[in-house]
Amino acid sequence: MTAKLPYDKTDPKSIERYAKKLIGKTFQDVLNESIYSNSKVGDESGKYCDEKRKGGLGNLLEKYYFGYEVNSDSEPDFKEAGVELKVSPYEEKNKGGYKAGERLVLTMINFNKEVEQDFYKSHVWEKCKLMLLIYYFRDKAIKNNLDYHIDYAKLFEIPEKDMNIIINDYKIIIDKILQGKAHEISEGDTMYLGACTKGATAAKSLVSQRYNENVKAKSRAFCLKNSYMTTVLNNYLMADECTDAAEFASEKELEAKSISEIIQDRLNKYINWNEDRIASKLGLDINKKNKSYEAIIVKHMLGVNELEDEKIDEFQKAGINVKVVKFKKHGKPNENMRLEDINFINLDKEPFDDEIKDEEGNDIGWEASRLYEILGNRKYLFAVFWEDEEGATFKGCQLWAMPDDDLEKVKAAWKELKIKIRNGVEFEVNGNIVTNNLTKSSENGIFHVRPHAKNSFYKFTDGTEIGNGNISDTDLLPSGDRITRQAYWLNQSYINSQLEDTLIRHH
């Protein structure tokens, strides 16, 4: 690789200008046009075209477009310019729009080394202070990775407001390491900066930790979370300038407190207030028959007018969703919590865990699934109300993320569900009653699948129709049968097991 570099390696803008020439090209184009390849293009193509391996494309650009050897040290890729190259996929969402295809891995965490407590002296900062983001579209119809199109190339500096949150995230992670609790780290601990598991099978890639010789921990890396990178993708790379979302907290507030603390401060002052009193205090005139009545009240309690979580800047970046948990009066338990309706055709098309891989060759089919996006990539702000004779009283809130061990149980249930759908859902008909073999609440203790439709209706491939609804109440199965529209639900008992005791109504 002795060819002269077609960019100034000391100038970030020069590197960016050269990178922008990639836009519209495929990775095969890069290989075909490379001035650095000393071997036959066919030989090089074979290394990167495995349809299961979604990684390696960043290495291809490093070597055959930018002309430098791949490095894995803590220095930036373009060290003379202080620029880190990050090549990553984006995908189309099932419901339209686009999302980051993966979290953005920054650097491995070495649990055996002394921890750097100053974020600005850490390897993480070296890897993220100035990044050249190159995004390609992961088109599921394309089988050869080299045929993916590169669509975006842009320098990115993390905004100062976000840095306050990231520094707090860093502190949360290193505090656990210093306490000898690296084995207890979870991505759910933090907002924007995560500590994701690494290794072909994370459960087998256990490493020792300096601060606790008795317990091994899963190998992990610092990363920018999928929810954060999805926001960067949509509001920065895909937009001429950053799209404004509703602001939850000011930069000054975030310098003094974490998002979690600000949420608690804003909501806790309403504890033991009746919902009517809260609405009156906030000047709200909302029809109580509105199914989103409490959710609207909670948003105003938080100081935002947006009902949609993804339109609140910090909630969008941290993947926070507000959910109202209501304990019924007269000794009735709170309800199961609906997460999202299921599209069975899309679920069937989702790859199994070992059918998709990241840059390092790790299985990520599960992490690319819709159910993981709902439960693994999100935090939930539970706003708890207790019903009484006069309506409902606010009892407090809890910011929650599903523990890693529970996500593993959900992963196993997701795999079983996909197998059932692929083999054909089994139905048992008894008059107008139709039962199926989809996930039951007793099977994993966390979630289940059950109907979410106004009316029940089934239409089977033999022409049989059962129920008092119509086609609009159904979803199509890969077999051709139509089933009453189904949804993922969190079990009521599981929600109770995760809530703080002061929020639970004991009977």
Task: Locate predicted features.
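Nucleic-acid endonuclease domains
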Residues: 1-79, 87-507
